[in-house]
Amino acid sequence: HATEVARQYGISVWIYDENSYPSGFAGGHVPADYPDSFNQGQGLELERATQLPEDIGSVFLCLLRENDSWKDITEEMTEYAGETGDFYLYRKTYYEKGDWYGGFSYVDLLLPGVTEKFIETTMRGYEKQVGNQFGKTIPGIFTDEPNIVTSGGLRWTPDLFEQFEKRWGY
């Protein structure tokens, strides 16, 4: 209805991409339709240590800095327990479920298929309802920035290291 009235008055209508901030989860529809899109760990939180603790707990990745190089000691962390050095311990962080995310958590925007599911869920609905006005009364659709909170950490997705090595060769 709004698009038709705007057309009659010569007013442009800009469509917001979805339900709420941040963009990418379509008000909970993306995680509902694509369960693999959330809670695989969306970040890696860094803890630096000069002595590797005896109880490493939920460490996902452990790097030892030696001079100007890095050594991945994740597989043999227990052998280094109690030793001193320049250790970088990373733990997975997870978005919490909440009402803001439609009862789900935020999605992993780096996971293949998430963007496609978002477009299918949101843009196809707009196209069906008012697609004949795209480029006319509706000059465009705008989006919010994604939620990539990783203060003190790294943005992460399950195949990050594999893709990095494939792209950069190391």
Where in the sequence are the language-model features?
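Mature extracytoplasmic enzyme cores
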Residues: 1-170
